Amino acid sequence: AAWEFIKNEDNPFELAVINPALVIGASISGDIGESNKAIAMVASGKMPVAVPLMFGYVDVRDVAAAHILAMQNPNSNGERFALVEKDLWYKDVAKLLIKNGFDKAPTFAVPVWLAKILANFSKELKLTLPYLGRKRSIKSTKAKEILGWNPRPAEESILNIANQMKDLGMLK
């Protein structure tokens, strides 16, 4: 709709679109947000097995930085920027968390066929059925080249939010 408006209104202003992947990172309030809940489920052991799901991760601070960079860069006009630092499977997130002291994270990864069976018993998992086993590959090349965007490692962001949730007593 925004692109259509710009086109139909004879370019009344500049427009750049920022499309982040799964936005994660420490919260400035007690509300951890929906995206971080996926990390909480893995870190707390509420996800007893690592299902074959892959997500692209990007830190909320890096999304904010990309917005500022786009506003400051005239070359961003008319561009769409995908933002992702890294694509990770849940099993990789679980391994990272276990390595850093979150011993409730799942140690066993299930294959797609078993995850599909398990989805019959979990409404959250049932929502992911179309994405099970699908490898994603979002590239942020344009944001890096045009905006000079340089995101922090996804692993750092995952550990930041996991540690914050642990400190707040949210991982039980």
Residue ranges, per PLM feature:
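A conserved pocket-lining segment of Rossmann-fold NAD(P)-dependent short-chain dehydrogenase/reductase
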Residues: 23, 29-30, 36-62
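Mid/C-terminal beta-alpha module of Rossmann-like enzyme folds, strongest
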Residues: 66-126, 156-172
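Glycine-rich Rossmann NAD(P)(H)-binding loop
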Residues: 25, 50-53, 81-88, 98-99, ...
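Conserved C-terminal active-site "lid" loop/helix of NAD(P)H-dependent oxidoreductases
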Residues: 118-150
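Conserved SDR Rossmann-fold cofactor-binding beta-strand/turn motif
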Residues: 19-20
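Active-site Tyr-X1-5-Lys
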Residues: 1-16
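Glycine/proline-rich active-site loop of Rossmann-fold NAD(P)-dependent oxidoreductases
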Residues: 10-13, 25-38, 70-80
